[in-house]
């Protein structure tokens, strides 16, 4: 099976999203509501294109092996270094087949059954976080609830809900302060100072992930606040036009945080080859969001599992052809640019 076949199952089942056979941002451009990007809409496309600039150094002069895709992330073994990225307000942006509660249920359950985890989206309705936390608890903590940068009292209310589930980690997509459709909400999402973020993190018993880091200085601030991991992300281009692609800034962030803080990356990653590229540039794992939305709308939990399987097979193929027997063997010497 290919991603194009998975996307074909979703065509006609989604709203603003076209379920394109290649999810490169060209069809949706700046269409919001919908999966488009902010302003000109080209950040999403540049995210996708940037990974393609890195060429693979093929090396088949090695002993035969079966690639080991397992990886450790914050004390949990994952079947592959791929996680489902958080998506919110799916009914508005993708169609009425799911709402945030049922979408979170779909990806959490499917990801856990495939040996990895899903980040869950936040929402204005309390039951969004409540439902995600409840299911994560039943799945033995296999999930990462993601909270928007709301006012401090709202953030703490949501933290109280998710901490009881003992998740792998808790995340905040700090760049969501730039989402135009959140600014007019009550309460609005807003910016967080290092001091404010540190106070939030100090209230958590679980590792805390800061999502939406796009510079070395931003990464250093997240580490100073106490982050256990950062996600290099420009929110799929939905929060600020004119920013670099995530692939462009990933190496700088990796250098800035050192070895004690995990680095994840999303944005335009669409294949096992892209996963390999991200790992070679220093990422510990990757997130995909839009493709998993398409997979879920196409065939529910099975669609999500199918996409994980496709990515796993593609990554294993590239590892074999480049001489990487394990995830730890992948390094930048396996790329040319």
Regions from the PLM with identified roles:
Residues 117-122, 144-146, 231-232, 286-288:
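Short hydrophobic alpha-helical runs that function as membrane-insertion/retention elements
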Residues 41-129:
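N-terminal functional module of multi-domain proteins
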Residues 128-154:
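Long, hydrophobic, well-ordered secondary-structure blocks that form the structural core
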Residues 51-58, 111, 163-166, 204, ...:
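Structural signal for hydrophobic packing residues in well-ordered secondary-structure cores
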Residues 1-29, 237-262, 270, 274-337:
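Conserved active-site-proximal phosphate/metal-binding subdomains
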Residues 94, 119-121, 144-150, 183-188:
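Flexible, glycine/proline-enriched loop segments at strand-loop-helix junctions
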Residues 109, 137-138, 150-265, 272-295:
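Alpha/beta enzyme core
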Residues 2-79, 330:
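An N-cap/entry alpha-helix motif that binds or orients negatively charged groups
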């Amino acid at each position: 099976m290919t991603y194009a076949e998975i996307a074909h199952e979703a065509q006609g089942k989604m709203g603003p999203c076209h379920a394109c056979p290649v999810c490169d941002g060209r069809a949706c451009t700046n269409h919001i509501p919908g999966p488009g990007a902010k302003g000109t809409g080209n950040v999403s496309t540049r995210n996708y294109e940037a990974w393609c600039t890195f060429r693979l150094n093929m090396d088949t002069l090695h002993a035969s092996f079966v690639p080991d895709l397992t990886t450790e992330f914050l004390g949990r073994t994952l079947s592959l270094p791929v996680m489902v990225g958080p998506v919110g307000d799916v009914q508005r942006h993708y169609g009425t087949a799911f709402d945030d509660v049922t979408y979170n249920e779909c990806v959490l359950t499917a990801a856990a059954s495939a040996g990895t985890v899903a980040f869950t989206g936040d929402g204005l309705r309390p039951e969004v976080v409540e439902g995600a936390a409840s299911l994560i608890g039943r799945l033995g903590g296999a999930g990462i609830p993601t909270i928007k940068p709301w006012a401090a009292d709202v953030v703490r209310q949501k933290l109280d809900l998710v901490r009881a589930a003992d998740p792998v980690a808790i995340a905040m997509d700090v760049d969501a302060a730039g989402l135009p459709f959140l600014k007019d909400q009550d309460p609005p999402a807003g910016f967080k100072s290092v001091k404010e973020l540190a106070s939030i993190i100090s209230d958590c018993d679980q590792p805390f992930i800061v999502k939406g880091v796009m510079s070395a200085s931003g990464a250093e601030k997240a580490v100073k606040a106490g982050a256990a991991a950062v996600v290099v992300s420009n929110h799929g281009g939905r929060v600020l036009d004119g920013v670099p692609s995530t692939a462009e800034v990933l190496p700088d962030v990796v250098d800035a945080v050192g070895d004690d803080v995990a680095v994840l990356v999303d944005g335009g990653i669409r294949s096992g080859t892209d996963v390999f590229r991200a790992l070679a540039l220093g990422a510990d794992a990757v997130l995909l969001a839009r493709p998993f939305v398409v997979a879920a709308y196409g065939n529910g939990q099975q669609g999500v599992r199918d996409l994980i399987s496709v990515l796993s097979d593609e990554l294993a193929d590239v590892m074999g052809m480049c001489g990487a027997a394990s995830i730890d063997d992948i390094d930048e010497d396996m790329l040319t640019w």
